[in-house]
C-alpha cells in the first residue's frame, strides 16, 4: 500500500500523523509512505529525522486580521495545488490522509480531483478551517471528539479518537525519583505548552514561593523560551524547574495531577493515561477550541477548568490544595478520563483506511 500523509504547522497535527505512520509500518511491512508538509514549519525538521520521505510545498495560512493579504494566500494556494498534483501523480498513492494545518488543504483537494481516495482527521472539538473546507471533498472524516461528529457530513464521519492515544499506552513509566522527587509525596506537573507561555510565566513566578511547606511536590516545565525568566527565583526543596523533558509522557505516568493547556495532543495524553488535570485553555487559539476541548472533559467530570483570566497565584495554589486533598475527586477524574480515552485509536484508523482502499 502507498500512503501520502499531510499535516503541518503544530505538534497537534504532526504527532497524531506520526502515530498513524508508526501503526501503518507495524501492520504493513511493505507500506510506502510520503509525507507532504510545508517548506518553513516544524514538520520540515521533524519528519526527515524520523527517516520518512518528505516533500515541502510553500503554503500560507489565511490572514484573519487583514483580508487583503489573503490575495497572496490564494495565489500561494493555487501554486501549491499544482505542485501537490504533480507529486501525487508521480507517487501514485492508494490513499491520501490529512491531519490538518493549512498545507493539508491543497494536498487533499488535489488528491480528490485526481480521484485518489482521501481521509481527513480532526483532532480538536471545533473543526479547523482546512478540515471544514475539505470535508465536502473527502471520502471519510475521522474525529477525536464525539462532539465534533455533528460538524461534518453525517454519512462519512466516524469517531475514532486520536491515534496519539494508542502510541502513549506503550511508553514506559519513568519514576519521579529519577528527577530527585520523593516517592511517597504527590507530584504535580505544571506545563504550558512545549514552548511555554509569556502570559503564564509572570503568573507562575508569583505562585512558586507559595509552594513552600506544601505536602506535595511541583515540577514546573517552563519551556525553552522562558527558563531564564525564573533564574532569580529561590525555590523551596519540593519545587524543581526544567526547560523541557524528553520523555514527559513516561513521567506523567508517575504523576498525581497536571496543570496544563488543553490542546488536542494533551487531551489524547491524559485520557490515555488517566491523569487528573487542571486545564488552563489557551485563549489565543482559533475559535477558542482549547476551551471547548476542556469543557468536553469537564462535562464528563474528567478535568477541572481554570481559565487564564481567573488564574493567579492564589487561585492556582488553592485549587491544587483542594484537589490533592480530595482523593475521591482524583479517583473519579481518573476513571472518567480512562472512559473517554480510545486506546486503540490508531488501529481503528488503520482499519478505516483498509476498508476505503479495498472498497469495503
Report the location of each language-model feature.
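Active-site-proximal region of nucleotide-activated glycan assembly enzymes
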Residues: 2, 42, 112-173
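C-terminal alpha-helical cap of glycosyltransferases
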Residues: 342-360
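Donor-nucleotide binding loops and adjacent catalytic segments primarily
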Residues: 41, 46, 50, 173-175, ...
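Short hydrophobic beta-strand element within catalytic cores of glycosyltransferases
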Residues: 260, 276-287
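A short, well-ordered alpha-helix in the C-terminal region of glycosyltransferases
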Residues: 329-343
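Acidic donor-binding loop of glycosyltransferase active sites
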Residues: 93-95, 245, 253-268, 275
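Conserved nucleotide-sugar phosphate-binding/catalytic loop shared by glycosyltransferases and other
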Residues: 3-8, 27-76, 81, 160, ...
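Glycosyltransferases and closely related glycan-assembly transferases
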Residues: 83-96, 103-119, 132, 136-137
Amino acid at each position: 500500500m502507498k500512503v501520502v500523509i499531510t499535516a503541518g504547522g503544530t505538534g497537534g497535527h504532526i504527532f497524531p500523523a506520526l502515530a498513524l505512520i508508526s501503526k501503518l509500518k507495524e501492520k504493513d511491512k511493505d507500506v510506502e509512505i510520503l509525507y507532504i508538509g510545508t517548506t518553513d514549519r516544524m514538520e520540515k525538521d521533524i519528519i526527515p529525522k524520523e527517516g520518512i520521505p518528505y516533500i515541502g510545498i510553500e503554503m500560507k495560512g489565511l490572514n484573519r486580521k487583514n483580508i487583503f493579504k489573503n490575495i497572496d494566500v490564494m495565489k500561494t494556494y493555487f501554486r501549491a495545488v499544482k505542485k501537490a498534483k504533480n507529486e501525487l501523480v508521480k507517487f501514485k498513492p492508494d490513499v491520501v490522509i490529512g491531519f490538518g494545518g493549512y498545507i493539508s488543504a491543497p494536498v487533499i483537494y488535489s488528491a480528490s480531483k485526481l480521484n485518489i481516495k482521501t481521509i481527513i482527521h480532526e483532532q480538536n472539538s471545533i473543526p479547523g478551517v482546512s478540515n471544514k473546507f475539505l470535508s465536502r471533498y473527502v471520502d471519510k472524516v475521522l474525529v477525536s471528539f464525539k462532539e465534533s461528529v455533528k460538524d461534518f457530513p453525517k454519512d462519512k464521519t466516524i469517531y475514532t479518537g486520536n491515534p496519539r492515544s494508542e502510541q502513549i499506552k506503550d511508553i514506559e513509566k519513568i519514576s519521579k525519583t529519577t528527577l530527585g522527587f520523593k516517592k511517597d509525596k504527590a507530584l504535580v506537573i505544571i506545563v504550558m505548552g512545549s514552548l511555554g507561555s509569556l502570559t503564564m510565566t509572570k503568573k507562575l513566578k508569583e505562585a512558586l514561593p507559595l509552594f513552600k511547606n506544601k505536602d506535595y511536590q511541583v515540577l514546573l516545565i517552563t519551556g525553552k523560551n522562558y527558563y531564564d525568566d525564573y533564574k532569580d527565583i529561590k525555590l523551596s526543596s519540593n519545587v524543581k524547574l526544567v526547560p523541557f523533558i524528553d520523555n514527559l509522557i513516561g513521567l506523567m505516568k508517575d504523576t498525581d495531577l497536571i496543570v496544563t493547556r488543553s490542546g488536542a495532543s494533551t487531551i489524547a495524553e491524559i485520557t490515555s493515561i488517566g491523569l487528573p488535570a487542571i486545564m488552563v485553555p489557551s485563549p489565543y487559539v482559533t475559535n477558542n477550541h482549547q476551551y471547548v476541548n476542556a469543557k468536553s472533559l469537564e462535562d464528563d467530570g474528567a478535568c477541572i477548568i481554570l481559565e487564564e483570566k481567573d488564574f493567579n497565584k492564589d487561585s492556582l495554589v488553592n485549587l491544587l490544595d483542594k484537589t490533592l486533598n480530595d482523593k475521591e475527586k482524583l479517583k473519579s477524574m481518573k476513571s472518567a478520563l480512562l472512559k473517554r480515552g480510545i486506546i486503540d485509536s490508531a488501529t481503528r484508523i488503520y482499519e478505516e483506511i483498509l476498508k476505503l482502499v479495498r472498497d469495503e
